[in-house]
Swiss-Prot record:
Mg(2+) binds at residues 242, 285, 312. Pathway: Carbohydrate degradation; glycolysis; pyruvate from D-glyceraldehyde 3-phosphate: step 4/5. This is Enolase. (2R)-2-phosphoglycerate binds at residues 163, 337, 366-367, 388. It comes from Burkholderia ambifaria (strain MC40-6). Catalyzes the reversible conversion of 2-phosphoglycerate (2-PG) into phosphoenolpyruvate (PEP). It is essential for the degradation of carbohydrates via glycolysis. SUPFAM superfamilies: Enolase C-terminal domain-like, Enolase N-terminal domain-like. Binds a second Mg(2+) ion via substrate during catalysis. GO terms for biological process: glycolytic process. It holds the Pfam family Enolase_C. The keyword Cytoplasm applies. NCBIfam families: eno.
Amino acid sequence: MSAIVDIIGREILDSRGNPTVECDVLLESGTMGRAAVPSGASTGSREAIELRDGEAGRYNGKGVLKAVEHINTEISEAIMGLDASEQAFLDKTLLELDGTDNKSRLGANAMLAVSMAVAKAAAEEAGLPLYRYFGGSGAMQLPVPMMNIVNGGAHANNSLDIQEFMIVPVSQPTFREALRCGAEVFHALKKILSDRGMSTAVGDEGGFAPNFGSNDECLSTILQAIEKAGYRAGEDVLLALDCAASEFYHDGKYQLAGEGLQLSSAEFTDYLATLADKFPIVSIEDGMHESDWEGWKLLTERLGKKVQLVGDDLFVTNTRILKEGIEKGIANSILIKINQIGTLTETFAAIEMAKRAGYTAVISHRSGETEDSTIADIAVGLNAGQIKTGSLSRSDRISKYNQLLRIEEDLGDIASYPGKSAFYNLR
């Protein structure tokens, strides 16, 4: 038995300089697991609640000492002595202790930190790498990365309404080569921007954040960077967008301030379809407001056979909402953010539900990240096939890519890189 003998919660800082929760779990054998949780900027209204102190004179109200206190008192008392290898039972204990639908009492940030730290401690005691602990012998597929090389929206202080413009390397034989491709395109884009006298400062997720005149101009510039780096757009590298449409939906209209447009759901569907016809876009995330299910239906009917339509704010890693979406034929993919739901068991359930329905599951970071690389192990362990973890800069993003390199090396000859086949929802 891997008995839990000590639990320590603490307040640390994330990549934006805001407080977040870290937890250490110590087992009877002396092994320890440590985990830190991320935090989002554009958040879905139905996400599990991260507990903040609200004390205006300290970290602008964003402190997490209440969540840390819950770990060091109530949660510690409830799980002390439990078997760390019994993840589902431990997460069930946390859920029952919280007693709310949205984890608002203990805080999803407190619960997730404990859930992750327990899994890491159990993997360490079992002598297994975390991805293998999660997935067993069947875990051998590396994920295709969606690399956010231009930031807009809530992730940057610029004129772009769309939040993320991403490159997706698909023709490479290995993850290592895909990562190299992404890095080379990133540096080619930096040179192009610099030559134009445009900003090469980066946003929250490590992508550039210049003031482009339009989304078209941004996408065209990325195509130039792909070519400049020696790759073929549409063959070696595809494009992906995260619209984060809930952020610019006001008074029943999609208000693209940077383009001077106010569009209905049908008009915004046409707008996205035009972009998908003009550019090699394989994936669009949050193309409609999280509550605009009629708009989502229109978008899915229009583009669902040729473009991956990812629900982030729409589904918030919640099986109840995902089930409804599947039944109604809304979207064809779910974004998986561990802190949206608050425990590993619930996270894994959402991934499996998506797969059974023929939806893809894209494992994702948050804009406020830490050096914790658990999502890399989840992507491989659960054979998710896709990961979103930022650009090719900032160590809070690179830590996940480097962990995937280590995993690929550890797997050796049995490692596989799916490329275009990761988009099985488009077959």
